[in-house]
Amino acid sequence: TDGNKEPTDFSVTLENGFKNFTDLQLKVFFRSSGRDNLITRKYEASPYINMPKGYGYEIQYMNMSGKKYKFMMNLMRRKGEEYASALGWNKAYDFMVEYTPTDSISYSIFYQDLKEKDWLNWLENNLLGTYEKRQRLTVGGINWFKGDKHELRLKAQMVAFTARSPQAYLANNIGDLIQADIALPPITLSDLAFQIRYRYEIKPLSYFYLVYTKGGRVVQYDEEDNLGEIYQRPWDDPETDT
């Protein structure tokens, strides 16, 4: 049996620029059915999983040339990706806004919300699970400069990942998934990375740095879906997994 049957993929990108410096891009792709020979970590009894064909589109609209405002918006609906297979459909949107009122300060915010049906997750050996997956990501930042001497940067990244409605499967030796009567818990993951960094130039190529960082990851097996609560968990107790 050939466990290295690679799918073929094809994509087309159309792009149009406007006089107001905005840019519109449409991308479509197709990926043939094939085998994922990585997901089971080379487990001998089930070395690969058969994956269906994939296809979808992505629309992007942006203006990254504005003097005070820059923005980007994306909308996606796809089954898998151009270079990665998936069992179910996913849809996502994201946006980014950057505001620079003066040359000395800028603010930015990025947000993404992704939902995927039948997200396939390897658990151990030939045991896998499918879930209703949702991932929300927020990234914010502030950059401030005063002349060539002072620089202050603040950045925060927060991830809220949930996997609901779990269903267990056992993979056989020809890549098929057989539904199994095994109880799997839901998953709620919170991830935080936060940093404030101040830099002072003592003299050319000689700097003083003052840095504060906070981060952590919390995994719990519950069904909390409130975004604020999930984001708050690693702030309160960044090393707690249950």
Task: Identify the function of each model-found stretch.
Residues 1-242:
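Exposed, low-structure sequence patches enriched in small/polar residues
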